[in-house]
Amino acid sequence: MYAIIATGGKQYKVAEGDIIKVEKLGVEAGATVSFDQVLVLNNGQVVVGNPTVAGASVSATVVEEGKNKKVIVYRYKRKSGYHKKNGHRQSYTKVKIDKINA
């Protein structure tokens, strides 16, 4: 059984027991969160939502919050001596999928 959920502007294919990194949710570790935007549900038969599956949700437990590896952004313009170097670390929340509620 799997589901495709939408959170943080992205879509994730999840099954029970999976651990995934999603965009920062702003809740502490150990808290339970529910994802209500279920786009596709497969429990032997595929159900496609329009745009979401009515009455379906996915419950998960927050494992941790953190930051990804640093991404270096480097810009320059030739012949003018313009150089700019920035770094960015995107925040994430790691969640463990507990149950897919159909």
Curated annotation (Swiss-Prot):
GO CC terms: cytoplasm; ribonucleoprotein complex; ribosome
An example Gene Ontology molecular-function term: rRNA binding
GO BP terms in the entry: translation
One Pfam family here: Ribosomal_L21p
Keyword terms, alphabetized: Ribonucleoprotein, Ribosomal protein, RNA-binding, rRNA-binding
Signal sequence region: none
Statement: the UniProt record of this protein carries the keyword tRNA processing: no
InterPro entries listed in its UniProt record: bL21-like, bL21-like_sf, Ribosomal_bL21
UniProt keyword annotation of RNA-binding present: yes
Family membership noted in the UniProt record: Belongs to the bacterial ribosomal protein bL21 family.
HAMAP family attached to this UniProt entry: Ribosomal_bL21
NCBIfam families in UniProt: L21
Function of the molecule: This protein binds to 23S rRNA in the presence of protein L20.
PANTHER family recorded: 50S RIBOSOMAL PROTEIN L21, LARGE RIBOSOMAL SUBUNIT PROTEIN BL21M
Complex formation: Part of the 50S ribosomal subunit. Contacts protein L20.
The protein, known as: Large ribosomal subunit protein bL21
Taxonomic path: Bacteria, Bacillati, Bacillota, Clostridia, Lachnospirales
Designated gene of the protein: rplU
